[in-house]
Amino acid sequence: EWTRPIYFSTTVGSDYYMSLENNFQLEGLAYRIVPYGGKNGSFINTDIMYDKIMNDFRWGGMDKNPDMYLDETCRRMCSTLRSTFNQLASELIAEGKTEKAQKVLQKCIEVIPYSVAPYEIIMLYVADNFYKCNDEKNGDLVLNTLIKDYGESLIWSKKLGRYNMRTNYQENAYYSEEIQRSLL
């Protein structure tokens, strides 16, 4: 009898999962262990996750204070949260629920605004999902912001000089490939 659920945080390293990944059900920021397994590892209960993200979670007021300062740890958590939004949206799209997916993506850019937490690479996938939901306006907004930031990063890297520019080469090459891939 599974009367008391057991959860693992999504931020815990996979080394601690004790080979239970096939029995993980993603419900927001936690994996719930369930007695049945997914086909290829963990799976998402979109109904539970949608309700938690859209109604239960509190977002700390980032959307109300564009001057809020986030330290590096908080900015990394914003990336984790954006990834969670995107995972849910991807699964909703796969289920044919594009209207709900679009609402999830819209909430993502509203509650974790660019002004407080600049976009990172996960936002390419958010932009792609906006396009899959036929929301070209928001897809373009996110993608154009990423392209602008990437261009500014390249200009900054060039000013570092040839030797120091090499340290940023790998990251810049990765971003360039991902942006090109998203434009196809």
Protein language model features and the residues they cover:
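ER/secretory pathway lumenal C-terminal domains and tails of membrane proteins involved
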Residues: E1-L184
